[in-house]
Curated annotation (Swiss-Prot):
The protein, known as: G antigen 12B/C/D/E
InterPro entries to which the protein is assigned, alphabetical: GAGE, GAGE_fam
Domain of life: Eukaryota
The encoding gene: GAGE12B
Family in the record: Belongs to the GAGE family.
UniProt biased composition (Basic and acidic residues): 103-117
Annotated region described as Disordered, given as residue ranges: 1-117
Biased composition (Acidic residues): 32-45, 87-96
Miscellaneous comment as given in the Swiss-Prot or TrEMBL entry: This gene belongs to a multigene family expressed in a large variety of tumors whereas in normal tissues, expression is restricted to germ cells. These genes organized in clustered repeats, have a high degree of predicted sequence identity, but differ by scattered single nucleotide substitution. Their sequences contain either the antigenic peptide YYWPRPRRY or YRPRPRRY which is recognized by cytotoxic T-cells.
Pfam families attached to this UniProt entry: GAGE (PF05831)
Length: 117
C-alpha cells in the first residue's frame, strides 16, 4: 500500500475582476453630503453643546483628562524601545565595549614614521 497525502502546493486562486470606478459610474456628492460636511449649529445654540447627554458627559471626561498632562506621549516613548529581557547588551553601553578597530588606532611609532617621511 502506498500513502497518498495531500499536496502542499496550492494553485494560485484566480483574481476576481473588479471594474474601475470610471466604468461603474460617477459618484454623486449629494449621497455623501451628510458624511462630508459636519452639521452646522443654529445661531441660538453654541457650537460645543451636544444634544446627546451621554456624549456631553464623554466630552467633560475628555476635558478632565486633557489637564492631567502628556501621559500618552510618555507612554509612546517607552514603546519605542522594546524590552528584550537582557538589557545589558542593548543600548549605547554595549557599543563602547567593542574592541577598537586596529586600522583606526595609531600607535605613537606609526605617527613618528609618517612624520619622518
Amino acid at each position: 500500500m502506498s500513502w497518498r497525502g495531500r499536496s502542499t502546493y496550492y494553485w494560485p486562486r484566480p483574481r476576481r475582476y473588479v471594474q474601475p470606478p470610471e466604468m461603474i459610474g460617477p459618484m454623486r456628492p449629494e449621497q455623501f453630503s451628510d458624511e462630508v460636511e459636519p452639521a452646522t449649529p443654529e445661531e441660538g445654540e453654541p457650537a460645543t453643546q451636544c444634544q446627546d447627554p451621554a456624549a456631553a458627559q464623554e466630552g467633560e471626561d475628555e476635558g478632565a483628562s486633557a489637564g492631567q498632562g502628556p501621559k500618552p506621549e510618555a507612554h509612546s516613548q517607552e514603546q519605542g524601545h522594546p524590552q528584550t529581557g537582557c538589557e545589558c547588551e542593548d543600548g549605547p553601553d554595549g557599543q563602547e565595549m567593542d574592541p577598537p578597530n586596529p586600522e583606526e588606532v595609531k600607535t605613537p611609532e606609526e605617527g613618528e614614521k609618517q612624520s619622518q617621511c
